[in-house]
């Protein structure tokens, strides 16, 4: 590495250093601070991985589930790490670190496939890993620390977007078959655990985008394309997952279902005289 190369790529180097520092900070937090910032939700997740390893089951016996089955979060990976470390906090911290790295790589790949400049890709990843908010329902605890309750849910639309971008570019499926495999797994996993939430908020909007893309192209014949076919197939798998989740008899995932209400029911009361 010579001085000329460093001079030409100084911003790229700086952004890479920033990302490494950010991942390192998240790793240190996950390995040292989880016992001190535990809350009701995260405590349930920590206890769940202990029971999953003890019972050697994904769906636990004699367990009071909350709003979801929790398997669309780092608990599956956490249970495996618990079998090695025998420490729930360390195990979940390691699972969260893996999640952070997966997000950084996946987000970078989406932007790369979309032909975004390299420096902008690195900057976007740096922003992705920035701890915008903390607290029980903050950005970081929901994705990269604590119980990571939305970590795997959000992987569903990100994986689907990565695949769709590749399809738009005309790449052969053999180059990204593994992404389709992971996307299908997380689609089914999330459906079983959390009900129709991600289907309504992530998968169906992507179908809407693809339909709009065809309409803008003014060629209705293009409506029968592999991108829409892929999304419809994933939606069907999602619906099957919902049915499977409900047939477990453990939980209805009511807390994760979308409840649509009439906004007129919440109008302000008339001012007093």
Predicted regions and their residues:
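Start-transfer (signal-anchor) and selected internal transmembrane alpha helices
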Residues: 1-26, 230
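Transmembrane-helix motifs of polytopic, lipid-linked glycan transferases
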Residues: 16, 94-119, 159-162
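Juxtamembrane segments of multi-pass membrane glycosylation machinery
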Residues: 57, 76-99, 103, 115
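Membrane-interface micro-motifs in multi-pass membrane enzymes
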Residues: 71, 119-168
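Membrane-interface alpha helices of multi-pass inner-membrane proteins
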Residues: 178-196, 202-205
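Perimembrane helix-loop-helix junctions
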Residues: 200-233
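Conserved small/polar residues in nucleotide/adenosyl-binding loops
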Residues: 266-273
């Amino acid at each position: 590495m010579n001085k000329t190369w460093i001079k030409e790529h100084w911003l790229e180097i700086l952004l890479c250093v920033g990302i490494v520092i950010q991942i390192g900070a998240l790793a240190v937090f996950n390995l040292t601070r989880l016992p001190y910032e535990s809350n009701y939700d995260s405590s349930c997740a920590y206890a769940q991985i202990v029971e999953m390893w003890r019972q050697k089951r994904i769906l636990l016996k004699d367990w009071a589930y909350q709003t979801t089955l929790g398997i669309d979060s780092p608990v599956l990976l956490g249970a495996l790490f618990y079998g090695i470390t025998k420490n729930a906090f360390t195990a979940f911290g390691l699972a969260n670190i893996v999640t952070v790295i997966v997000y950084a790589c996946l987000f970078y790949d989406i932007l790369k496939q979309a032909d975004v400049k390299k420096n902008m890709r690195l900057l976007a990843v740096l922003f992705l890993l920035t701890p915008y908010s903390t607290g029980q329902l903050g950005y970081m605890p929901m994705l990269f620390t604590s119980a990571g309750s939305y970590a795997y849910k959000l992987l569903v639309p990100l994986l689907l977007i990565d695949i769709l971008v590749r399809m738009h570019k005309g790449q052969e499926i053999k180059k990204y078959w593994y992404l389709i495999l992971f996307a299908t797994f997380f689609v089914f996993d999330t459906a079983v655990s959390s009900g129709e939430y991600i289907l309504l908020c992530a998968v169906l909007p992507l179908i809407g985008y693809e339909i709009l893309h065809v309409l803008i192209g003014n060629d209705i014949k293009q409506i029968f394309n592999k991108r829409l076919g892929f999304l419809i197939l994933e939606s069907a798998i999602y619906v099957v997952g919902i049915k499977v989740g409900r047939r477990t008899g453990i939980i209805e995932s009511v807390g994760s279902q979308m409840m649509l209400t009439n906004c007129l029911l919440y109008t302000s009361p008339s001012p007093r005289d």
